UniProtKB/Swiss-Prot annotation:
SUPFAM superfamilies: Multidrug resistance efflux transporter EmrE. One of its GO terms (biological process) is choline transport. This is Spermidine export protein MdtJ. HAMAP family: MdtJ. Keywords: Cell inner membrane, Cell membrane, Membrane, Transmembrane, Transmembrane helix, Transport.
């Protein structure tokens, strides 16, 4: 559970960092860029700890996919960006891909000990 919380923190800080980059680029000074650097750095730190117990493919797909989903939603709400039918279709495809990756990942079993050979 702890590693899933770390992954959630990685996703939240990635979203915050990316949105602050946009915020800074529309003229709000250096504070946005500083916030971006801090948040993106924290995001990678949280992600690096999360992948200790979560499969890398799953963690990265969730981190990037959920990040893209929420960044797109917040970009529409906060920065008046357009949300076309194609973008919606892309986001739905992204969500379907995340679900497939997550559901198709199995926990590794315990390693099987190699049988010892009897010498004749």
């Amino acid at each position: 559970m702890f590693y899933w919380i770390l992954l959630a923190l990685a996703i939240a800080t990635e979203i915050t960092g990316t949105l602050s980059m946009k915020w800074a680029s529309v003229g709000n000074g250096n504070a946005g860029f500083i916030l971006m650097l801090v948040m993106i750095t924290l995001s990678y730190i949280f992600l690096s700890f999360a992948v200790k117990k979560i499969a890398l493919g799953v963690a990265y797909a969730l981190w990037e996919g959920i990040g893209i989903l929420f960044i797109t939603i917040f970009s529409v709400l906060l920065f008046d960006e357009a949300l076309s039918t194609m973008k919606i279709a892309g986001l739905l495809t992204l969500v379907a891909g995340i679900v497939l990756i997550k559901s198709g990942t199995r926990k590794p079993g315990k390693p099987v000990k190699e049988a010892t050979r009897a010498t004749i």
